[in-house]
Curated annotation (Swiss-Prot):
One of its GO terms (biological process) is GTP biosynthetic process. It catalyses: a 2'-deoxyribonucleoside 5'-diphosphate + ATP = a 2'-deoxyribonucleoside 5'-triphosphate + ADP; a ribonucleoside 5'-diphosphate + ATP = a ribonucleoside 5'-triphosphate + ADP. It is found in: Cytoplasm. ATP binds at K9, F57, R85, T91, R102, N112. GO terms for cellular component: cytoplasm. It comes from Rhodopirellula baltica (strain DSM 10527 / NCIMB 13988 / SH1). The active site is at H115 (pros-phosphohistidine intermediate). The lineage of its organism: Bacteria, Pseudomonadati, Planctomycetota, Planctomycetia, Pirellulales. HAMAP family: NDP_kinase. This is Nucleoside diphosphate kinase. NCBIfam families: PRK00668.1 (NF001908). Pfam families: NDK. Belongs to the NDK family. Its cofactor is Mg(2+). The gene is ndk. Keywords: ATP-binding, Cytoplasm, Kinase, Magnesium, Metal-binding, Nucleotide metabolism, Nucleotide-binding, Phosphoprotein, Transferase.
Length: 152
């Protein structure tokens, strides 16, 4: 099984969309294996967005991501990185297709509700930033046999 990091950004938290977003992931059959509410510090922001720190838009990104709590979630599932990114839609909410999270709930490029890892490497790096090894819960869902075939 593959794991990915999902961050419900300050706009998602402030707009009280946490439950709606989590419901969509759960309805898709994705498995929550860790979750916490936290305030991103400027230091954590710089670590998370290290590739953007020198870019002109970074100061506003840091200001936004540190402005209110976020919900960090570790999701597990088959091809979960691709599946989650498909569910999110285009980065810019104005360009995201209806039916995607951003298409349904966002109309902004920066305030686009959710961050998700874009590769296995970034997923591992980001999961390590937000969670300690002992914070992951490995458990079986009784519904798993009804979500996909054994050979998938």
């Amino acid at each position: 099984m593959q794991r990915t990091l999902v961050l419900l950004k300050p706009d998602c938290v402030q707009r009280r969309l946490i439950g709606d977003v989590l419901s969509r992931f759960e309805a898709k059959g994705l498995h929550i294996v860790a979750m916490k509410l936290l305030q991103v510090t400027p230091e954590l922001s710089k670590q998370h967005y290290a590739e953007h720190v020198e870019k002109p838009f970074y100061p506003s990104l840091e200001e936004f991501i540190t402005s209110a709590p976020v919900v960090a979630i570790a999701l597990e599932g088959l091809e979960v990185i691709r599946v989650v990114r498909d569910m999110l839609g285009a980065t810019n909410g104005l360009q995201a297709a209806p039916g995607t999270l951003r298409g349904d709930y966002s109309s902004s490029r920066q305030m686009n509700l959710v961050h998700a890892s874009d590769s296995e490497e970034s997923a591992q790096r980001e999961l390590d930033l937000y969670f300690n090894a002992d914070e992951f819960c490995d458990y079986s869902l009784v519904l798993t046999p009804f979500m996909r075939a054994d050979d998938e």
